[in-house]
Every structure is written in C-alpha cells, then in structure tokens.
Amino acid sequence: MPLVYVTLAEGTTSQDQRTRIANGIYRAMVDVADVPEDDRFQVINEVSCANLIYSPDYLGFDRSPSVVFIQIFLNAGRSVDVKRELYARMAENLGAAGVRADDILINLVEMAKENWSFGGGELSYPPAAASSTPTTGS
C-alpha cells in the first residue's frame, strides 16, 4: 500500500492537471514498482507560495514556482534499478500532464510491513509477512 503525498503551490495547476499528475504517479507505480491495481491512496496538498520553500537550482536543476513534491511511503525492498525506472516513468507521465522534469522532486520512504494498518486498528499483514522484507508488492 503506497501512500502518496503530492505538494504544490496554490494556483499553479488546474483540477484537471492535478488529476493527471495523480494518475501519472499511480500508473508509474503499478507499471514499474509492482503496486497492485486498486491500491491507490493519494493526497494532494496545495500550499501558498510563501509556504513552499525550496532551492531553485540545487544539484543543477532549474526549478520553477510550479515545482511538485512527491513523497511516497511504501513497503521496503525494491531495487535501485526499479527505483530509477520509477523516477523516470513518473517524470515521463507527469511531463504528459504538463509538468517540467526539473520541477519534479520525488522522495521514497520505505517502510517495514508491520508499520501499516489499513483499518480496524489492526496490523494489516500477518506476522510472518510483517517480519520479512518483500522484494515486490505495494
């Protein structure tokens, strides 16, 4: 179960573009990172420009006021190659939604399975599954 937070500046995107951004992120996770269909949990936050603080040229990128921060909490275990492909696919998909590649900042936060409760106040994975680190899956 990836949990995705997208943060962007107020007034820089339309509702249609935000939907396309969310769809592009989700599609990349399903196609590249082996996230199951219908395993979709996303939050889009629009914040005032005054509350979106970033270095516009850090590491040689040319970030604009339309920068998009993407933070994904997901089960641990994907390879560096899968992560690299995921980042590239997200940039491609978001590019189709009108977001410049230099304006995309992605952060993956890998979690152990025992750190998830999908509801009911219960550990969502059986103890045997929670104690092992997966190589694929959400």
Short names for language-model regions:
Residues 1-138:
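Interaction-mediating elements
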